[in-house]
Amino acid sequence: MSETYYKNPFSCSFSAGRWNPKGLGMIYAGSGPAISLLEYLCIKGNAFSGKSWYMIEFEISKPNLIGTLEKESLPEQWNKLPHGKITQDFGRIWLQEKEFPFLRVPSARLNLSFYPMEHNLLINPDFPDLKKYIEFDGQVRFDYLLNSI
């Protein structure tokens, strides 16, 4: 997260993303620091170099509340670049149904063979009592160290 937002880890953008349509907030997280950094770098490019960023570390107190999107259930062209409406429609339904506060999904940046070992985690910020299920362990300040092109 940028320096502006890291103090409120439950904040989210209402801009459209791969798994959410514009106007519906969703928090995107990763299974670890490397995939989280890769995702952000792929989305933003080097536009954010030279700024300080924060990685928010958290634990989910009830892992049984993490849903998993199985490979066989992935929407057609789920990893299309740029992302398509089909994954946004899937995410909209998931957000509105509120079956799970968390949903494990594959990264469009990695080969599917890495899933579910490496994955993204979608978090529904409107899930009832969401804050009861997440424990924040802190944050790590970092800078992207990119080679100049």
State what each model feature region is:
Residues 1-12, 21, 49-149:
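Active-site and NAD+-binding cores of ADP-ribose-processing enzymes
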Residues 18-43, 121-126:
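Extended catalytic/binding region for NAD+/ADP-ribose chemistry, centered on the ART fold
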